[in-house]
Structures are given as C-alpha cells and as structure tokens.
A protein has these predicted regions:
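Interdomain boundary/hinge elements
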Residues: 5-6, 22, 97, 189
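Conserved alpha-helical scaffold flanking the Walker A/P-loop in AAA+ ATPase domains
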Residues: 23-29, 34-62, 95
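Hydrophobic alpha-helical scaffolding
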Residues: 28, 32, 67-68, 133, ...
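Post-Walker A helix-loop "phosphate-sensing" segment adjacent to the P-loop in P-loop NTPases
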Residues: 1-6, 10-18, 84-86
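Walker B catalytic acidic pair
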Residues: 59, 65-67, 77
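Basic, amphipathic alpha-helical bundle interface domains used for macromolecular binding and assembly
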Residues: 48-49, 72-271
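Residue-level recognition of specific faces of alpha-helices
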Residues: 4-7, 41, 53, 66, ...
Length: 272
C-alpha cells in the first residue's frame, strides 16, 4: 500500500539507492544475500548507521541461500528483527531504529556434500553435526514453514510437461482472498495479518475446540515445542484455515501446520 511504499522509499533514500530510472519504488523488494555477508551488511552499520539488507527488504522478501554457510553470529542477529520487525543500532551519537518487516526465505542442504540422508552421503556424523549446528534452535523457532524438497527423478526431469494439482495463478487467487479475509477481520485493530498476532490476540483469533486442543497438547510434548514455536503453529494454522475459506481452525489445518515443524526434529533433533 501507499504507506509501505513511502516507508520503503525513505529507507532507500537514506541508503542513496534511488535513481532517475526508478524514482519511486512501487514493487515489494526481493533481496538476495550472499553467505559471505557481514553482520553490518545484513542489519546496517557505519559511524552514522545506514540501513542494511534486512531493511532494504522491508515489506518484501529477504532470501538467504546456503543458510549454514553463513557465520552463526551473522544469523543470530536476525532473531531480534524477526520478532520485532525492526532493528536497533546503538552508537555513541544515539540509537537508530530502522524498519525491517521482511519475509525470510532460505534454502540449504542437509550436509556439506548435499546428499544426506541418502546412502550416497560421504559426510561423517561429526561433519553433519558441525554443519547443522550453524543454525541454532532459537533461530529455528522463528521459522514458520520448513519444507523438504525431494530429489527429482530422471523420468520427471526429462518429461516435456509436468502436471500440477493447482497452477500458481489459482493459488494466487486463494492467497489474495485469504488476505482480504484477514483485512476484514482486523479492520478495527492495528493488526494487518495473522503473523502479527500476539498474546491475548492469539486466544481471540486462533481459538481451538476440544479435539484441536488435544492435538496441540500432544504435539507440544512429542515435538518438545517452545512457547514461541507453539504460537507460530497457531498463526500458520489460522492462515491455512483462511486459505481454506474456513472461519474455524479445524483439525486438518492444525495437522498441516504442525507438519511444517517436523524437520526440526528429523535433522536437528538427531545431530544437534
């Protein structure tokens, strides 16, 4: 919207990145950061701090490829902005706060050679542990959706066309409708989307019935969830319900949301 566009343009102006070809940014940004990026490059820095990549991705997407290749200390600085949607940089001249409300998207292999858990993997357990331990549990808690991409079979690779249950265009319509539902639901509040729900708001808008409550209780114990990951599952389930045109969070919505957290247990639970 207009307010988001103006805020983003101010950030790019402070960074000196506006030019005559695109004097006004009207599209959501997509920022891809290389794994050699420093802490200052990511969150901002300088004697007089300037916005970093997380602020340049404000209202858009920040993409981190080869996630475990980043220094752990660099990844850890993302924990605050992922919660607060802003970053604070302190200097002797004062405190500087930059907006950083971005969607984090990342990709990674499960080991240095990229073939674990296949028998073709050449890594030792110690190498796998060292690789995965670059990503801490508190950082993982802030990841809402974890999806494992399976190996593409040769017969699928050489197919001239691959059929999909739904096209991107069809999915886009459902997502836009879900955002409209959220806009109506939160029209008299400061909340813009489900991801912004906290505290009492979760109890109000993510209410569960008996069967759903029992499932969440089981998941909390079996998956050893933290309070943060528990609340994030509720928000994801609320979004899945919206995409499914449902006012209530049903059992199948919760099951899908919980399924997006199982990679933590599958890989990090084994080696970290």
């Amino acid at each position: 919207n207009y307010e988001e566009s103006m805020e983003l343009n101010k950030l790019y102006r402070v960074r000196g990145m506006l030019d005559g070809r695109e004097p006004l940014i009207s599209r959501r940004p997509f920022r891809e950061v290389h794994h050699t990026a420093t802490r200052a490059a990511l969150i901002g820095g300088g004697i007089v701090p300037r916005p970093g990549e997380i602020s340049l991705a404000h209202s858009g997407i920040l993409f981190l490829d080869e996630l475990p290749e980043f220094k752990r200390s660099v990844l850890e600085v993302l924990r605050q902005p992922l919660e607060q949607r802003s970053i604070q940089i302190t200097r002797t001249s004062g405190n500087y706060i930059f907006p950083a409300d971005f969607m984090l998207v990342s990709a990674m292999n499960t080991c240095p050679c990229g073939k674990f858990p296949s028998t073709a993997c050449t890594c030792t357990p110690a190498q796998i542990q060292a690789y995965l331990s670059k990503i801490s549990q508190p950082f993982l808690d802030r990841i809402d959706l974890s999806v494992e991409a399976s190996k593409v079979e040769y017969r699928d690779l050489v197919k001239e066309s691959v059929s999909c249950p739904e096209s991107s265009a069809v999915i886009k319509v459902r997502v836009c409708e879900a955002r409209k539902r959220q806009k109506i639901r939160y029209q008299n509040t400061k909340i813009q989307c489900n991801a912004m729900l906290h505290g009492a708001e979760l109890s109000k808008y993510c209410r569960l019935n008996g069967e759903e409550m029992r499932l969440m209780g089981q998941a909390y114990e079996v998956l050893n969830l933290t309070a943060r990951s528990y609340h994030r599952i509720l928000k994801v389930a609320r979004t899945i319900a919206d995409i499914d045109y449902s006012e209530e969070i049903k059992l199948e919505h919760l099951q899908e949301a919980i399924g997006y957290r199982t990679l933590d247990r599958k890989y990090w639970g084994r080696y970290v």
